[in-house]
Curated annotation (Swiss-Prot):
It comes from Dehalococcoides mccartyi (strain ATCC BAA-2266 / KCTC 15142 / 195). Keywords: Aminoacyl-tRNA synthetase, ATP-binding, Cytoplasm, Ligase, Metal-binding, Nucleotide-binding, Protein biosynthesis, Zinc. This is Isoleucine--tRNA ligase. Pfam families: Anticodon_1, DUF5915, tRNA-synt_1. The lineage of its organism: Bacteria, Bacillati, Chloroflexota, Dehalococcoidia, Dehalococcoidales. Its EC number is 6.1.1.5. InterPro entries: aa-tRNA-synth_Ia, Anticodon_Ile_ABEc, Ile-tRNA-ligase, Ile-tRNA-ligase_type2, M/V/L/I-tRNA-synth_anticd-bd, Rossmann-like_a/b/a_fold, tRNAsynth_Ia_anticodon-bd, Val/Leu/Ile-tRNA-synth_edit.
Length: 1014
């Protein structure tokens, strides 16, 4: 006997019970250890930060990380999965700052670095219990007891070793360059961090500013004669910018050498801009006083909008860093560059070398002046009228100042894409300063070549989003002017300036006169800042630089750092024993600029090879309306809300099947509820149906019931089952759980809506003949196989089916479905022709029901005829062979198959068409057909009464009735049919005995009273 199945199963409670079963039996551990002799399969877990609560997007990534290793284990692989925690960096620091009420780095310095970092250390596992609970609740099997932790000394030391390898190859350098800078956090950011913080539709100024040309430079440029104009009218160059705060640092204007420029007569003055931009700026109607090429403008000089020296800001020469004297005339040049666009602006680009990457490059190339009037907190310095203000606040003041001086041509607003800090959400500024860089551009070709060895899902990511990122790769600004992170392992001599990178603690201890290390090792600031030694070159004091590492460097180093490579002897075999490279990683698509990139870059820089082979890139989660989830929109769904209501399997199944992995997917309680109803409950109802009838008949599973002549319906479902095994195996092997899951959905639909429905009478009949036993065994085989196919997807439901269907029948079986092998298809049982024929019958039946629905004809009402037009004549034989099934499904008396292309007349027919297929039902109803339809309606009402009266499925009853003349004649005419369908021993006209369950009914305007009793 199987355990009785509750048709109204509480899935969340069932899952809690199964979690306990797994824990009691140590199933996860056994699933790994039992496969120790198998080939290794390695998952790299992208480490989350546990100082914040897990969200629904974490559930998405974790269930996709889970499904493939579960499948691989069932295929015989040894697949230990080690978790990880990202414990450094801005995500941690900002939370602690918030707790302490800090608003700047100065607050941290006053508080004390040691105390601040101690708070960071204690905060990183603030929500670890919630992470662990969620991980267990969704059945994400990963070893968190032995998780790697990026703040551990051993992990940090491996990160140092990795950087030393790059240093020794000449790939690490310090440079004064423009880098993305967060004024709130007071630190540089890498390009991949910046890529994660862009916001669309950001509103900013759009100002067009006039720069007055120094007239004496016209003669030098040879334009004085070419452009003859009244000497009393000034001549301006018109430039455009969205960052007015950078205008005080302007030291050049850039033009395109090959493009045409026009001088417009603006009545009171002349103004120069690119000719192709006149129409867009609505200046085409202004008189043109002259034209020239951009190259002709090179050599002109103009007056600065602001003379920085008047406001206490030095002006330096980028060629030699010398300072421009106060008495020296200050004029700035017009230069030609390749980056001037004719698609926006004026064709004249405002250039401020201190605040733009291309601007800085131009400054170096042309030896421009350099003005730095903004501090690291993003505030204007000097004695400007707008000094002390944050740059974005100063925009208005600067624009107002220029307007008052007659230098503002237009002052508008625009919406565009702008970068914000990925952690604190402050607007970034581009800022020239010293930073440490990894020369990733030196290995650009290797990065691109290695990417071609990686299998990306979806495939377009390889040469699209990720490939483009690699093609446009820039050097990695890896240093951060912060506190809680892996210290940059570079020491500089305070005397001679020599620098060197240290690759490990023992190497450091071996340095001459090394001192400062505490008894308890802690490789963090401020302790590591005290570690000094003597310079090999001059004997001076070697002191560590103050920066810490980008936390993306930490997570990107995990392939080696998690094993303390190469310091632990057993770590040196990672490439031989299958721990490197990873077989599989999975995260959201934005990690193409984050973890996916840092992993690939570090591995290429050190080993010149990729460190992962297969990657599933996940799209983002949206709300039910397709909008991004955010607290401000109040549309964030907490995982517990859905898990407590529908269970983890429902959420997992929705994520796998709702959309391909790379697509954005909508998410809501309602959508998960639909999955529960459409798939899990359908499967559960089949399972419940089987157990109910198998227990009634005391069925014991045995393969012998499927030997010899197997009924066609059973042969078909077993054929479909074995084809399903092939398809799911292929899908998961190809890292496509969506396609695999959808095939399972299709099969469960076939099983429920066709096989079980068409086999019901086989289960209902009283005798246990070969046909009935074959049906039981076929359905049992399907359910048991499904439990194993579903194990990687919906581990709880799979376990429930296995525990009840397998272990109850064979106590010696493996104690969990997750310890079993993945099903292997018996290809000898696959009958493609039979599958196609029955699928055609299902298609015709579905279209026929649609045609009936159009004519408002109930399914219980028999019809005279159905006419079918097929796509090809070759399909006719199979359909006619199975004609009886079509007649039964559509409740019609006759089937006619027409020639392909036949047009069925509309009169007296209702039709449904799909492509070349048409199914039409005859809508005319004879008295005999109407009577038969009424009899079927009476059966339906009696079946409902049986349930309401509390009878079991197999109970026989006695039925009494009172009816009008028409219904009485129908009942007498179809009495045998009614008795058989309702398990009525007798069908008696007249009132029933006392205590019988009674109902008074109206059937198409006719009155009927029914009583049912034992």
């Amino acid at each position: 006997m199987f355990k009785a199945v509750n048709p109204r199963q509480n899935f969340p409670q069932m899952e809690e019970d199964i979690l306990k079963l797994w824990q009691d039996k140590g199933v996860f551990k056994k699933s790994i250890e039992n496969r120790r002799d198998g080939k290794r399969f390695t998952l790299y877990e992208g480490p989350p930060t546990a100082n914040g609560r897990p969200g629904i997007h974490h559930v998405l990534s974790r269930v996709f990380k889970d499904v493939i290793p579960r499948y691989k284990v069932m295929k015989g692989y040894y697949a230990p999965r080690i978790g990880g925690w990202d414990t450094h960096g801005l995500p941690v620091e900002l939370e602690v700052e918030k707790e302490l009420g800090f608003t700047s780095k100065n607050d941290i310095e006053k508080y004390g670095i040691a105390e601040f970092n101690a708070r960071c250390r204690s905060s990183v596992f603030k929500y670890v219990s919630e992470w662990n609970k969620l991980t267990e609740r969704i059945a994400y099997w990963v070893d968190l007891d032995n998780a790697y932790i990026t703040m551990d000394n051993n992990y940090i030391e491996s990160g140092w070793w990795a950087l030393k390898q790059m240093w020794d190859k000449g790939l690490v350098y310090q440079g004064h360059r423009v880098t993305p800078h967060c004024p709130r956090c007071g630190t540089s950011l890498s390009s991949h961090e910046v890529a994660q913080g862009y916001k669309d539709n950001t509103e900013d100024p759009s100002v067009f500013v006039k720069f007055e040309i120094a007239k004496e430079s016209l003669a030098k440029a040879g334009l004085a004669k070419k452009w003859a104009y009244p000497a009393d009218k000034p001549l301006y160059l018109l430039a455009w910018t969205t960052t007015p705060w950078t205008l005080p640092a302007n030291t050049a204007l850039a033009v395109s050498a090959a493009d045409q420029y026009a001088i417009l007569d603006m009545t009171d003055y002349y103004m120069i801009l690119a000719k192709p931009r006149l129409s867009a700026l609505k200046l085409a109607e202004n008189p043109v006083a002259g034209e020239c090429l951009g190259s002709d403008l090179s050599g002109l000089f103009y007056k600065p909008l602001f003379d920085p020296r008047e406001f206490g800001i030095p002006v330096r020469n980028m060629q030699d860093n010398s300072e421009t004297g106060v008495s020296e005339e200050l004029l700035y040049p017009v230069i030609t560059t390749s980056y001037v666009s004719m698609d926006d602006g004026t064709g004249i680009v405002h250039t401020a070398p201190a605040y733009g990457e291309l601007d800085y490059e131009s400054g170096v190339k042309y030896g421009l002046k350099f003005v730095h009037h903004v501090d690291l907190q993003g505030r204007i310095t000097g004695s400007y009228p707008f000094a002390g203000k944050f740059v974005k606040e100063a925009d208005k003041d600067i624009s107002r100042n220029l307007k008052e001086r007659g230098l503002m041509f237009r002052n508008e607003r625009m919406h565009h894409t702008y970068p914000f800090c990925w952690r604190c959400d402050s607007p970034l500024i581009y800022y020239a300063k010293q930073s440490w860089y990894i020369r990733t551009t030196a290995v650009r070709d290797e990065l691109i070549k290695g990417n071609q060895q990686i299998n990306w899902y979806p495939e377009h990511i390889k040469d699209g989003r990720f490939g483009d990122w690699l093609e446009n790769n820039i050097d990695w600004a890896f240093s951060r002017e912060r506190y809680w992170g892996t210290p940059v392992p570079i020491w500089r001599c305070e005397k001679c300036g020599r620098t060197e990178c240290v690759g490990g603690i023992d190497e450091l201890k071996a340095k001459p006169n090394f001192k400062g290390m505490q008894e308890k090792l802690d490789i963090h600031r401020p302790y590591v800042d005290e570690w000094t030694y003597d310079c090999d070159k001059c004997g001076g004091n070697m002191k560590r630089v103050t920066e810490v590492m980008d936390c993306w460097y930490d997570s990107g180093a995990m392939p080696v750092a998690q094993y303390h490579y190469p310091f632990e002897p057993e770590s040196r075999s990672i490439a031989k024993d299958g721990r490197f490279p990873a077989d599989y990683i999975c995260e959201a698509v934005d990690q193409t600029r984050g973890w996916f990139y840092s992993l690939h870059a570090i591995s290429t820089l050190i080993f010149n090879r990729p460190c992962y082979q297969n990657v599933i890139c996940l799209g983002h989660i949206l709300d039910e309306r397709g909008e991004k989830m955010s607290k401000s929109r109040n549309n964030v769904i907490q995982p517990a809300t859905v898990l407590d209501k529908y269970g983890a399997d429902a959420v997992r199944w929705y994520f796998y099947t709702a959309a391909p992995p790379g697509n954005a997917r909508r998410f809501s309680e309602k959508l998960v509820g639909e999955v529960t109803r459409q798939f899990l409950l359908m499967l559960w109802n089949v399972y419940s149906f089987f157990v109910t009838y198998a227990n009634i008949d005391s069925f014991t599973p045995s393969e012998k019931y499927l030997e010899g002549e197997v009924p066609e319906l059973d042969r078909w479902i077993l054929s479909e089952l074995n084809q399903l095994v092939l398809d799911v195996d292929k899908g998961l092997d190809n890292y496509d759980p969506t396609q695999a899951g959808r095939r399972i959905e299709d099969f469960v639909g076939y099983l429920s809506n066709w096989y079980v429905r068409r086999s019901r009478r086989r289960f209902w009949k009283s005798e246990n003949d070969a046909d009935k036993l074959s049906a039981y065994q076929a359905l049992y085989t399907c359910l048991v196989t499904l439990s194993r196919l579903l194990a990687p997807f919906t581990p709880f439901v799979a376990e429930e089916l296995y525990q009840n269907l397998v272990l109850s029948a064979d106590p010696s079986a493996l104690e969990s479905v997750h310890l079993t092998d993945f099903p292997v298809a018996d290809t000898a049982l696959i009958d493609e022709q039979l599958d196609n024929e029955i699928r055609l019958v299902m298609k015709v039946s579905s279209m026929g029901r649609s045609a009936r629905s159009k004519a408002a004809l109930k399914v219980r009402q028999p019809l005279a005829e159905v006419r079918v037009v097929l796509a090809s004549a070759g399909e006719r034989t199979g359909l006619m062979r199975l004609a009886e099934q079509v007649l039964e499904e559509l409740n019609v008396k006759a089937l006619a198959v027409e020639e392909p292309g036949t047009v069925i007349p509309e009169k007296n027919y209702a039709a449904s068409t799909e492509g070349a297929y048409t199914v039409a039902v005859y809508t005319g109803l004879s008295p005999e057909l109407l009577a038969e339809g009424t009899a079927r309606e009476i059966v339906h009402r009696l079946q409902t009464m049986r349930k309401s009266a509390g009878f079991e499925i197999a109970d026989y009853i006695n039925t009494h009735y009172q009816a009008d003349e028409y219904l009485d004649s129908v009942i007498r005419m179809h009495s045998e049919y009614i008795k058989k369908e309702t398990l009525s021993n007798q069908l008696i006209k007249g009132n029933a005995p006392e205590g019988a369950y009674a109902e008074s009914l109206d059937i198409d305007g006719h009155s009927l009273s029914l009583w049912v009793a034992r």
